[in-house]
Amino acid sequence: MAAPRELVNKYHRERVDLLMYESTGIWKCFEIKNTVSDFRSSAKHSFWGDYGYYILNADIYSKVKDEIPDDIGVWLVYKPENSKGWMECVKRPKKRKRLCSHESLMFALMQAMSREYKKYRKNLEKENKTKKNKIKKR
């Protein structure tokens, strides 16, 4: 189960790009970085769970490889032209101390799922409205 989420600690809000919960009780946090400047920006790299990963393309990885902490893993995204693409884990993370409770992470995941469902419903309603308008014009 995974969804984008926002976590709040007593000082500020942070958005984790992707949060995954495994049935074994393990939380994995993923930060997606699309450019080297995005990787190096002052925006937080939020690794709240037991394991943290960056999701990068090979070009970015080659430029920031030495800046990645030892305990953070890396997934590389490959997307050749005319292909669905794939991902490969090129660096395994080390287990870290979780920065917030299981309950807080679960609540954040549930909130994110609710937000994503609402977005899905809104888009579906837009599509249905567009289809109805096309039918009326015939």
Label the model's feature ranges.
Residues 27, 31-79:
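Catalytic cores of nucleic-acid endonucleases
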Residues 1-11:
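A short acidic/basic microdomain associated with nuclease active sites
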Residues 11-29:
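Active-site beta-strand-loop-beta-strand hairpin of nuclease catalytic cores
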Residues 6, 40-44, 94-99:
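Extended interaction regions within the primary functional domain
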Residues 14-16, 36, 58, 93:
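Generic preference for well-ordered secondary structure
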Residues 3-4, 19, 75:
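Residues in well-ordered beta-strands of folded domains
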Residues 5-6, 21, 32-35:
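Acidic/polar N-terminal loop/beta-strand segments that form early-domain functional surfaces
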Residues 10, 65-138:
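Non-catalytic C-terminal interaction segments of nucleic acid-processing enzymes
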